[in-house]
């Protein structure tokens, strides 16, 4: 009961008017001394140099200038002029968006810290769930039971008013919502806030924190409706009569949605969507929906999602956004792996009294394979090999010292070995390692102006020993190379719970 009351109190804290006083009053700087929020906002509370300007002090000075009407009169043929002050629109846009994003993140940080405080087990669990590999152990247990998987590309962009309405459910600050709406509409790239195309990616690149906040708000709303319809329960706990009234139009949309499905599928009701073995995973702007159901059920889910996006978010979804994969006939491209279900036949001899029977069974195993062709193409693009996978030297790194060259190649190899340690088949991973090893040797030989064979004979393995040993330390963990435990580890899958990002291969060029 106490835990429920504490959760209820934290949920109600979202209704406080927190954004307006934080922006317009001076005691915001006292938050810098709060150890709870020090890490998340201290960087924005400081006034930075001209190369990296992002400060709430500057944001507070910019807000009055935004509301001065004479700054908003801009000639149509002058797209580079700044509507916020006549200087650099990109700089001011970035400062205001970053300041707004860090403030609205405060309630979520408080809820998370309150949940993890004093609970070491939950803190460790939360840390492990942040890893990119944390999804694979879950799929390892469930994927083999799936018959169909829907590979879903989350739709975008969302209209600006939809985003403002989503935030209105938990931000009870009219001034803040007006400021947000004003800022969004005045941004010259407002029509592509969450569009990942290169031609319109200015906002997402220069305003990453704000971009992720808006995107996560949109995804959170979409998933909450999805869970609501799956469970046929109340959507988003209503704590006030205003919330209930705001949801009337939403329930009207749901009734209309059910009518559409009733006309399209006369025998289908919302109950048929309840699948006791339905699993949902979201990752990198995509999501997968796995089920043990039939093809008809997955088609119903597909059309349901399309109508949900159209009726609630007013988004048109092209057919290619949802792709259905049948297991085990096809594999799924999931987070850099080709994931599939393989049927391993086995024969069991059973004997009853004088009669013996042979029973043939097919065991479904979860398989993860390294996409060797994609990795070779990526290495070829980075000039480590040609398009056929033949290792070549890296001339750009030839001017570096031997230790730097070995360290760079070793870091790339360790990162790939670390991430693809969960592969069921190690042969492809060994091929990638071979390409990097020989490319390193060719680069060193090019630097010393000798052939690879002469270089290896002269220096033997002294220079490359550090490269190979450092690489194998990741795979061997604490086991020795000759131990049986390491031999089993080398053949099996290993998932790491400390991978929070994928290092860029070319970041050190």
Swiss-Prot record:
Location of the protein in the cell: Plastid, Chloroplast
Report the GO terms under cellular component: chloroplast
**Main location per the UniProt record:** plastid
- Annotated signal sequence range: none
Q: Which cysteines are joined by disulfide bonds?
A: none
Q: Which UniProt keywords apply?
A: Chloroplast, mRNA processing, Plastid, RNA-binding, tRNA processing
UniProt-listed Pfam families: Intron_maturas2, MatK_N
Q: Which InterPro entries match?
A: Domain_X, Maturase_MatK, Maturase_MatK_N
Name the GO terms of the biological process aspect: mRNA processing; RNA splicing; tRNA processing
Q: Name one GO molecular function term.
A: RNA binding
Relate the protein's function as given in its record.
Usually encoded in the trnK tRNA gene intron. Probably assists in splicing its own and other chloroplast group II introns.
Q: Which family does it belong to?
A: Belongs to the intron maturase 2 family. MatK subfamily.
Protein name per Swiss-Prot or TrEMBL: Maturase K
Q: Which gene encodes it?
A: matK
